[in-house]
């Protein structure tokens, strides 16, 4: 996959400024194309990374009970409007066969997946699927809560409205008690 083409983004931003009736040579926006290009390279950096790579570092721990990392902040861009959505991800898994990954690896996986034009539903399922594929745990549950600027600043204009998505894999799919336990841990501050 090609890397971000900064020059092409700069050109496109100049065209947008012209298309909305602004002067791209005006002092206040003269460097805007460069700034936007650099920002896009950063916020879309996940396009050029494999999120599963973070999960390959495992520790041979004989732990086969719940691991939960909650309130992992993330920022992403809605693929429909290219405006931000942001929130927190809660990632729970039940290790199997001594495959326990570092806690930071779960956060890095969320970040890599979020840093692309995205849908919240896809972030949620891709995190769960990546963990299932690499760590082969007994089960995974991912809960993502986010506010979408496409709902806040345009369209229905509902600031503060949160969207919650879930993905459940493995033994947790058929274990309501375990899912409820995870949800109760997530609610605990």
UniProtKB/Swiss-Prot annotation:
Transmembrane segments: none
Keywords: GTP-binding, Hydrolase, Metal-binding, Nucleotide-binding, One-carbon metabolism, Zinc
GO biological process assignments: one-carbon metabolic process; tetrahydrobiopterin biosynthetic process; tetrahydrofolate biosynthetic process
Any single Gene Ontology cellular-component annotation: cytoplasm
Pathways per UniProt: Cofactor biosynthesis; 7,8-dihydroneopterin triphosphate biosynthesis; 7,8-dihydroneopterin triphosphate from GTP: step 1/1
Reaction catalysed by this enzyme: GTP + H2O = 7,8-dihydroneopterin 3'-triphosphate + formate + H(+)
UniProt cross-references to InterPro entries, sorted A to Z: GTP-CH-I_C/QueF (IPR043133), GTP-CH-I_N (IPR043134), GTP_CycHdrlase_I (IPR001474), GTP_CycHdrlase_I_CS (IPR018234), GTP_CycHdrlase_I_dom (IPR020602)
Tagged with keyword Flavoprotein: no
EC code(s) of this entry: 3.5.4.16
Chain positions recorded as Zn(2+) binding sites: 78, 81, 150
Family: Belongs to the GTP cyclohydrolase I family.
Assembly behavior: Toroid-shaped homodecamer, composed of two pentamers of five dimers.
Name of the featured protein: GTP cyclohydrolase 1
Name of the coding gene: folE
